[in-house]
Regions:
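Transmembrane helix-bundle core of multi-pass membrane transporters
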Residues: 1-67, 94-97, 159, 171, ...
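Conserved catalytic core of two-component sensor histidine kinases
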Residues: 3, 78, 130
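Hydrophobic/aromatic residues within transmembrane alpha-helices
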Residues: 9, 83-84, 136, 152, ...
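Conserved catalytic core of Hanks-type protein kinase domains
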Residues: 16-19, 77, 107, 181
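Helix-loop-helix "hairpin" substructures at the membrane interface of multi-pass membrane proteins
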Residues: 40-119, 143-149
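A helix-boundary/kink motif common to multi-pass secondary transporters
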Residues: 79, 90, 141-142, 165, ...
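Transmembrane alpha-helical segments in multi-pass inner-membrane proteins
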Residues: 100-106, 110-176, 181
Length: 193
């Protein structure tokens, strides 16, 4: 709920500061570069770079959260701040690190999105819905599940768009609802500790 409220404030601030015009990032020939897999299948290089970046970031986060002292403290504080404080976790420091990681990841995601498509201050709501659906499809609390959920959502929308572009977003929502109905914990639920 706080994220939706914050997104409305940010959206209106961007409209006031920069206008509501649609924009895109210039990436030169990278925008049209692709890798031919044969059989008439071409994958855009920007998409491959985005997937590779996502895998690297998620892998790095997984290692950070499971192997570093700060990462373990972050996980503990997300479960119970008072108990984490008893073990020496400084809640303000943990929240500051978590916020820095979140904003850094957000900036990287924004750059990757800007290289693939145009954007405007009002585009965030739809992207936020897709992100929410990817997290739920993959499983709350599972980093790799979120990646899988995003891939399933994106591939479903792309496959349906090939046949009927008007139904692509609806198809993604149907997959989301099907996962909620048949596997509400997600495809890769987080392990309970």
């Amino acid at each position: 709920v706080a994220t939706f409220g914050l997104s409305i404030v940010i959206q209106n601030a961007l409209i006031e500061g920069f206008s509501a015009d649609v924009r895109s990032l210039e990436v030169g020939r990278l925008a049209t570069a692709s890798v031919n897999l044969g059989a008439g299948i071409d994958l855009p290089l920007v998409g491959i770079l985005g997937l590779g970046t996502a895998i690297a970031v998620i892998g790095g986060m997984q290692v950070f959260l499971s192997r570093s002292r700060t990462g373990r403290m972050m996980r503990a504080a997300s479960d119970d701040v008072e108990t984490a404080a008893l073990t020496g976790a400084n809640a303000r420091h943990i929240y500051a690190v978590a916020t820095a990681i979140a904003f850094s990841t957000l900036a990287l995601a924004g750059i990757l999105l800007g290289t693939r498509s145009s954007f405007s201050p009002t585009a965030g709501t739809l992207i936020l819905i897709f992100a929410f659906e990817a997290v739920v499809i993959g499983g709350l609390g599972s980093l790799w599940g979120t990646l899988l959920g995003g891939l399933i959502l994106g591939l479903t929308q792309s496959a349906v768009a090939y046949y009927d572009p008007a139904q692509a977003i609806l198809a993604g929502h149907v997959v989301f609802l099907a996962v909620l109905a048949f596997r509400p914990q997600g495809l890769i639920p987080a392990r309970s500790v």
